[in-house]
Every structure is written in C-alpha cells, then in structure tokens.
Amino acid sequence: MAALTRDPQFQKLQQWYREHGSELNLRRLFDADKDRFNHFSLTLNTNHGHILLDYSKNLVTEDVMRMLVDLAKSRGVEAARERMFNGEKINYTEGRAVLHVALRNRSNTPILVDGKDVMPEVNKVLDKMKSFCQRVRSGDWKGYTGKTITDVINIGIGGSDLGPLMVTEALKPYSSEGPRVWYVSNIDGTHIAKTLTQLNPESSLFIIASKTFTTQETITNAETAKEWFLQAAKDPSAVAKHFVALSTNTTKVKEFGIDPQNMFEFWDWVGGRYSLWSAIGLSIALHVGFDNFEQLLSGAHWMDQHFRTTPLEKNAPVLLALLGIWYINCFGCETHAMLPYDQYLHRFAAYFQQGDMESNGKYITKSGTRVDHQTGPIVWGEPGTNGQHAFYQLIHQGTKMIPCDFLIPVQTQHPIRKGLHHKILLANFLAQTEALMRGKSTDEARKELQAAGKSPEDLERLLPHKVFEGNRPTNSIVFTKLTPFMLGALVAMYEHKIFVQGIIWDINSFDQWGVELGKQLAKKIEPELDGSAQVTSHDASTNGLINFIKQQREARVQ
C-alpha cells in the first residue's frame, strides 16, 4: 500500500484543511444549519437499548465527512475488515489471525483459520467456563476445608488484567450473588501483599492468567500466592482446589500444581488486549454470572455485525476512527480524552489507554518503512464530574486542542434521591460539550461582568480571563443503560475504531514489540542488583542509578 501521505484522497483532504481548516467555526456551523444534529448523528438500535453517537460538535462539514469516507475506501478498510473476520493472518509480524470476533460469535457461523473452523473449540471452552462458574457460584466447588469460595483473585498483567478489571468494575450492579474479585498485576510486592492480608486461604480461589505460564510478573505473584496459601493448607495437593489456570502450557501448569482439568485454554489468534472475551474473562463470569458474561459477548457481537455490514458513512466505529484521523493527521492533535460520566466506568479510559496505545503506538508500516505522519494518540481520561475539577481547565482554555469523547447512560443504576444525583450528572455532561463548542465571546463575558456589578477597571482586568474561545471538538455517546450487553457493544465499538485507524496508517495494530526491549534489559540488570559491587557495564546514567540503589538499600531511615 502507498504511504498515507501519498494517497490522493489524503492529499485532497490535506489541501482542503490548508485552505479552509482555520475557517471552521462550530458556532457558525450550527447557526447555518438548524438540522446539524440530524445530519451529524447516528442512533444504533439494539434489542437491549440504544446508542446515540452525536458527532455534530466536531470541526467537520459534509464535504469533510465525504472526503474522510473516501479516504477509508482508498486505504482498503472494507477489504481489511473482511480479511479480519475471515481469519486471515493480518497480524503479519507474528503470522497470526486476529479473531477476538470469533470469541463472541453468537450466531455461531463458521470462522476458519488454516481451513479449520475455530467455533467448536471456542464453544467447548465457553461450556467449560459455564460449568465451572455454576459450580463455584452455587457453592458446589469447595475449598480444602469444605468452605465455599468467597473471593476470586485474578493474577495476570496487561491484557490478562486490565480488561477483566475494567469489566468487573463496570458491572458491579450485576454481581450480588457472586464472589468478590481481586486483581493482582504489579510485580511490586505491595500489590500482592496488601491483597493477601484481606483474604482467607480456605475460601480463596486464584486464577493464574498467563498464556505461556512464563510471564515473570504473573508467575512471581502466583508463586507468592501459593507460598502464602500453603502456610495455611500445608498439603500441596490442596493447591488443585484453590488454583486454576488460563493458559496453553499444560506442562508448566501441572508443574505448578494445578490440575490440567482446571486449565482454560485460549489461542494464539487472541491478542492480550482483546482477550477479555476469552477464558481470560473467567473472573468476570464468576463475579457477575455466566448469563451476564454471555450478554457481554452478545453486545460485542451486535457491534461486530454493525461494523461488518453497515456502509462506512453510517458505521459508528468507522466514523469515530475517521474523526480521529482528521484531528491527528490534519490538525496535529496528539491526545484523545475519554470521559465517561459513570463512576462504574472509572477504568474505561485506562483500558483503552492500552487498547489504543499498544495497538497503534507504531512507526513502522507493513512494508517495513518508517511513517512520515503521526499515528496513535495518547489516550487518557477520568470519570465525570471528577475530571471537571482536575484537568478540564486545560481542555477549555489551554493551548492544545484535545478531541474528547463524552459517554453517559440515560438511566442510572442508582436513582437515589428521586434521581437527583443523575440529573445533576446529566446536566454537567450536556453543559461541558456545549461549553467546549460555544465558548464565551468577549461581548458575552463583558455583559456577565457588568451584570455582576464590576467596576470598569475590574471589568477590563478580568475580561480576557473570562473569555472562552470554544471551537473544541467533542463526540457525545449516550446510551440507554450500562448493562452487560451495552458494555460489550461499547468496548467492541472502540476496538474496531482502533482497527480502522491502524489500516489507514498501514501499521500492524496487533503486535507489541515495543514492550520487549525493556523486559530483555531488566533480565540483564536483575542479577547486577545482587551484592554491593559497583556496576560499570551500562551508560553513566544507568550505572549511577544502580549504584545509588545498592548504596541506599541498607540505609537506616527515621
């Protein structure tokens, strides 16, 4: 594929931006088109609620949207989409298919990898998960002293942690009959130590989530958990009742003491950051119940079908992707804020920080050449309204343009005080996108200060600080209620957005070589931290840091 910057459709878009980009003014666009909302919004109607994507508060015209859709066609988005769904090995650096869509393929149509339908294997693992969940949640599965399981501890890192953690937090209202869940990921001993102090070994079930069963952080934490458990249980055979594995390495799992019957498999065509739909989601299913886990899969499958079959100009993931391309590659925006107005979604931005940045944080194209344009943005965010009292100042009046996605459910899980809390939340959600779009003109600010009785001197002094330029772009994503189905649909929507952007940039969104170099160097440094001998084998900075750490290790601290 030709480089993006040499694509005639992209050059046409850039030319339009150079000639007209500075003239785009959201206030004027809304004044000129009273139907702008209808022209630039999309409603997705499912049997489990609706999703409204309002992208009218973006710096776009109908011409811009047409050019963006033409760019998607020119870059081969439709053909690439089919290649993914058909099980072709689009992860070309690792020679793997990319089939998280198969994990939630509720229509059960055949999906082939190397000529073999993967769906029987997918369904077999789902059936095994269902049976296991029913045994644990019903109390049929007992610990070594005969107690039922009250706590499930997922030990994993990256994709084996962020997805299940985000989902179990988001679906807390659906967990009333399930065990508590805990997530341990960090190699920092504080994480496992603090967690274990709150647990009873007799009623704890550990899930060790590691495809290879060799991930250093995960296996170190798992061994620490096993050591803690055996201090109480004494008998190593008791491990089988309290530890299960999400892995493909039967030998290592057996060596650890886990019964291979309690090993849940997944496949090399499941990328870590797309794995919550697989056996990696076992902690989700245990916490909220397998029926709700299936609803999560069904919501994602609904979005998969929408993404695969809907024309690009009405396709929610495609539109989100194209708007991102517009801001990153024409306006030069470097970050993207995800701002969910729902406390249950407090890990949503962190989840897609990995989903987006590990997928599209690349500078090498499929042909092995360096890109000459920007790729993946820095993704960040916090729940509303907390963020309003933290970083929105910079979004409103800072020197950087930060495109934002605002998300909110119409119905709350907690309509306390006759819905007062949620009404205030909704009002703030609506006010922020209007404020970012409209801003406040000099005349409006002056009238406001005059009405407040400010003296002419105070008025002139304060006036420039009270002006908001506005013209800050946002998407509003409003959905009926945060149910398992709806969460599945929202997550899949953003997954496909990331995929589309990767295709347009001609990068591989499904490998992560960038995490390897640091791990290699850490293995070399680890033995150098032993003893007190000065280290001189690195650059001056790294040597200095190692030697300072060695010197301070035994220092007495008051």
Swiss-Prot record:
Pathway: Carbohydrate degradation; glycolysis; D-glyceraldehyde 3-phosphate and glycerone phosphate from D-glucose: step 2/4. Keywords: Acetylation, Cytokine, Cytoplasm, Gluconeogenesis, Glycolysis, Hydroxylation, Isomerase, Phosphoprotein, Secreted, Ubl conjugation. The modification N-acetylalanine is found at A2. The modification Phosphoserine is found at S107, S185, S455. The modification N6-malonyllysine is found at K454. The keyword Iron does not apply. Its main location: cytoplasm. The modification Phosphothreonine is found at T109, T250. GO terms for cellular component: cytosol; extracellular space. D-glucose 6-phosphate binds at G159, S160, S210, K211, T212, F213, T214, T215, Q354, E358, H389, K519. The active site is at E358, H389, K519. It is found in: Cytoplasm; Secreted. Disulfide bonds: none annotated. The keyword DNA repair does not apply. The modification N6-acetyllysine is found at K12, K142, K454. One of its GO terms (molecular function) is cytokine activity. It catalyses: alpha-D-glucose 6-phosphate = beta-D-fructose 6-phosphate. Its EC number is 5.3.1.9. One of its GO terms (biological process) is glycolytic process. The modification N6-(2-hydroxyisobutyryl)lysine is found at K34. Pfam families: PGI. Homodimer; in the catalytically active form. Monomer in the secreted form. Belongs to the GPI family. This is Glucose-6-phosphate isomerase.
